[in-house]
């Protein structure tokens, strides 16, 4: 029988955004970044109240279809807990639909909030599993949960009926690595950008990416001088160039100048990983072209604070 949680209990969750793929690690590699959404969740007498401030304000639903709300309910169900009502207040700083893990952060925030409300019965692995289920892949969600860099993977059910299993392990990131995001002023649909990918790839391209993922893991942990080589990719970015021409242009421009630039997630954000700042000239040119420049650091894991018992 589900446990009824007390009215007045309140938690605050701070969740980092993330960059997925990191070039070759399609649906596998992720990196938590220092741009954060904060979600306040309180148990109330009845009903549902949702407020959104910042990114997505006036654009996202304010009812039970809001992703944070759906994730809270998923977390509560798994924790075998019930609430009479919820007040959810979202303070969003992660640009939405830009390839910076905003939807994964929302899912992580919801599941983490439910875990805090219920007294933390869920393991870290369960939080990754539940949040990743909303995405269909674990790279962004795992990065937001674990912080730092992650290697993640999916095991599909053999019976075709049960849910996929999502798993991840964290990597210690070299302390000198920083990130610079160039964010275009338009959205990218993850579904649309995925549709352009081929169902099959050549063995030589698969072999190329396997080697670059291995290089990227070493680059992130020990050898940041290998970041340029480690961000090379043949599985997804070449196919997405036609639907994201602005992104492709900037990725190529930066890479031609020696920067480890890649398409962040499904885009359209261009991400640069480096140990030195990107040149002021390039950043000024990006701003003049209408791109928002965000200087970022590698982020710590999601934080859950119980405000009121």
UniProtKB/Swiss-Prot annotation:
Known catalytic reactions: L-homoserine + ATP = O-phospho-L-homoserine + ADP + H(+)
The EC number on file is 2.7.1.39
The entry's ATP-binding residues are 95-105
> How would you classify this enzyme at the top EC level?
transferase
Domain of life from the UniProt record = Bacteria
Tell me where it mainly resides.
cytoplasm
Annotated pathway: Amino-acid biosynthesis; L-threonine biosynthesis; L-threonine from L-aspartate: step 4/5
- One BP term from GO: threonine biosynthetic process
GO cellular component annotations of the record: cytoplasm
User: Is ATP-binding tagged as a keyword?
Assistant: yes
> Keywords in UniProt for this one?
Amino-acid biosynthesis, ATP-binding, Cytoplasm, Kinase, Nucleotide-binding, Threonine biosynthesis, Transferase
The molecular function GO annotations come to: ATP binding; homoserine kinase activity
**Annotated localization:** Cytoplasm
Question: Which NCBIfam families does this entry report, sorted A to Z?
Answer: thrB (TIGR00191)
Family membership, please give it. Answer: Belongs to the GHMP kinase family. Homoserine kinase subfamily.
* Protein name per UniProt: Homoserine kinase
